[in-house]
From Swiss-Prot:
GO molecular-function terms, A-Z: adenylate kinase activity; ATP binding; zinc ion binding
Species annotation: Salinispora arenicola (strain CNS-205)
Residues at which Zn(2+) binds: C130, C133, C150, C153
Chain residue ranges for the region called LID: 126-163
Subunit structure and binding partners: Monomer.
Main location: cytoplasm
List of residues binding AMP: T31, R36, E57, L58, V59, G85, F86, P87, R88, Q92, R160, R171
Family classification: Belongs to the adenylate kinase family.
Any one of the GO CC terms: cytoplasm
Protein name: Adenylate kinase
Catalytic activity as recorded in UniProt: AMP + ATP = 2 ADP
Gene3D superfamilies listed in its UniProt record: P-loop containing nucleotide triphosphate hydrolases
Length: 217
């Protein structure tokens, strides 16, 4: 099965991608992993990407799409894959459709993790990161025994800039502007399935797998 996973920041995409890919026995492919692999191996595409990254610029779609093409052409993706973090825009989605046609295949399904903005802000703004060991706690869902201190190493906890409510709100606006139109794009193709991403991680995984069973069964 060939899948794309979409959803706003804080929806739990990374976690669900791992579980769903393992359930389907297909590789989880993220653009972050692809970038790191190409850059560390010094591939021609990696060299191009690093040039932009070092300059603090966005890597052009052409470079990203060619990296994705190379990854999807590898043998382990021949029977299926789960894409996490790509596509992010409708032009990227159209390019993905084209490259899959070139590879003689097509997407089967797009899973959308659905969670409202207030819940995303609650999830992300409650995170606290340990200055010592890097462990991430949560003031509501996974609080340390002593407020502001890490149970693991005793170091101070802090709120990353990315987790501050105003930053989260900005990220949500960016998602709505750029990535949310993917929902319409894939909905028009009849490939979109919405998954309620509220509640415990395990419950969300069950909903996602049930949706896949309904599709394939």
């Amino acid at each position: 099965m060939r899948l794309v996973l979409v959803g706003p920041p804080g929806a739990g995409k990374g976690t669900q991608a791992e579980f769903v890919a393992a359930h389907l026995a297909v590789p989880k492919i993220s653009t972050g992993d692809i970038f790191r692999s190409n850059v560390s191996q010094g591939t021609p595409l990696g060299v191009q990407a690093k040039r932009y990254m070092d300059a603090g610029e966005l890597v052009p779609d052409e470079v990203t799409i060619n990296m994705v093409r190379d990854r999807l052409a590898e043998p382990d993706a021949s029977e299926g894959f789960l894409l996490d973090g790509f596509p992010r825009t409708t032009p990227q989605a159209a390019a993905l459709d084209k490259l899959l046609v070139d590879l003689g295949t097509a997407l089967d399904l797009v899973l959308e993790l659905v969670v409202d903005d207030d819940e995303v802000i609650r999830r992300l703004s409650g995170r606290r990161t340990c200055r010592g060991c890097g462990k991430v706690w949560h003031v509501e869902f996974d609080a340390p025994s002593q407020e502001g201190r890490c149970d693991r190493c005793g170091a101070e906890l802090f709120q990353r800039d990315d987790d501050k409510p105003e930053t989260v709100a900005t990220r949500l606006r960016e998602y709505a502007d750029k990535t949310a139109p993917l929902v319409d794009y894939y909905g028009a193709q009849g490939k979109l399935v919405g998954i309620d991403a509220t509640g415990p991680v395990e419950d969300v995984t069950v909903r996602a797998i049930d949706a896949l069973r309904s599709y394939s069964g």
